[in-house]
Design a protein with these regions (language model features):
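Alpha-helical scaffold/interaction cores of sigma-54-like transcription cofactors
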Residues: 1-157
Length: 157
């Protein structure tokens, strides 16, 4: 799903499953966010996060993913299941300014996994082509995502 057109199609398809016929405010918000995602080359990173969450879910690994730096208020992230915050349910919050400004930088991600499932999670991260570095045993915290090239992000855990 790393190609932007495929990514965009997936976002709209999933949004239609959630909202039905897309209200103008939802379509406008998705358009704005997708423009920023494309402009700032965030397609691969977000597609990787979708794959990670899907892989964890398919293996029955409960995870709690926290996004910071504005990505946590993204409708795209919500629609794709990366974030649980739906900005459309909170119209009183002006979240667009965070999205516009922060899509220029990679999000800070914290992924908490039970200690006894770390080996399984490491295998999933390896299968996704992510380099895993851990100083000590404990919950996984993705502290930093480093953009390497058009096809890869390194996650520092």
């Amino acid at each position: 799903m790393a190609d932007f057109d495929v990514f965009q199609t997936e976002v709209y398809s999933t949004a239609k499953e959630i909202f039905g016929v897309l209200p103008n405010e939802v379509k406008d918000r998705l358009d704005m966010e997708l423009t920023g995602i494309k402009k700032n080359n965030r397609t691969i990173m977000l597609a990787t996060m979708v794959s990670l969450m899907s892989s964890l879910e398919s293996k029955g690994i409960a995870s709690k993913l926290s996004l910071k730096n504005g990505h946590n208020v993204s409708l795209v992230c919500n629609v794709l299941g990366i974030s649980t915050f739906n900005p459309m349910k909170h119209p009183q919050l002006i979240t667009e300014r965070y999205i516009i400004n922060t899509l220029e930088s990679a999000p800070v991600i914290s992924l908490r996994i039970d200690k006894d499932r770390q080996d399984a999670v490491d295998a999933i991260l390896h299968d996704l082509g992510l380099e895993v570095e851990r100083e000590e045993a404990g919950p996984i915290h993705i502290r930093k995502i480093k953009y390497v090239d058009d096809n890869k992000y390194d996650f520092t855990l």
